[in-house]
Amino acid sequence: MTMKTHLDLEQRKQLHGTAYVEQYLQKSPKRLRDLVDRMNIEITSDIVDFGCGDALIIEYLKDVVNSYQGVDFSPEFIRVANRRKMALHAKNVKFQCESIPDFSRHHKNSFDIGFALDLSEHVYDDEWQNIVTAMHDCLRPGGQFYLHTPNADFLLEKMKQHDFLIKQFPEHISVRNAKSNSHFLSVAGFENIDVKFIPHYNILRGLHPMSKLPLIGKFFQARLFITAKKPIN
């Protein structure tokens, strides 16, 4: 679901400025550890992190992959990410501050694994397809892609959509459901698309057992973890 007011690129960059970066640093690292554990990663893997943010995830990846490259359009996030890289002495880590389509033009067929964690909800539909296709192009044939994002069918997201008791985060301009996210991946050329509904990473994770209930279960499926593959041929 897309917000009613359409923000231009500069407005969105301002939303992801210093204040947002500082707020983001307070998020629980456990959610990233849980997501990494869901990925099929090997020591020989070359990884690209689309919308890498502050790159807290490199703490869990730098010693178990061949290389990691993060790309983000926010200079503030890239500065924080580079400071983290230096503090961790992560020599196999690199960051690039640019758009994903621009990054893709000079990184085609370059990575075994790509992921976009909590990125898609920050991008409008009319831009997202181009970005998903660019991410697809960055992967080598047979490469694996992982997407993590809020689920638009989750009860709390429904409430935000209608401004009922709780408002949507201003940065979350396009929260989608499983069907919509899968469609974008399919159009880009991905195959073997698999959707898993996983718990929220805060106190709301306590609602997840209710996701098994008939008829109303979908309203308690907080997060999406989607796996897809770039065809070999």
For the regions a language model picked out, list residue spans one by one:
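Conserved N-terminal segment of class I S-adenosyl-L-methionine
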Residues: M1-N109, I113-L117, Q129-V132, G206-H208, ...
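Short catalytic micro-motifs in class I SAM-dependent methyltransferases
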Residues: D118-H122
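A short glycine-rich, Lys/Arg-flanked "PGG" loop and its adjoining helix->strand segment in the class I
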Residues: Q129-P141
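Conserved beta-strand signature within the Rossmann-like core of class I S-adenosyl-L-methionine
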Residues: G143-T149
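A C-terminal cap/extension of S-adenosyl-L-methionine-dependent methyltransferases
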Residues: Y146, K160-H162, H183, I193-N233
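Short, glycine-/aromatic-enriched active-site segment of Class I SAM-dependent methyltransferases
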Residues: P150-H172
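Short alpha-helix
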Residues: I173-A188
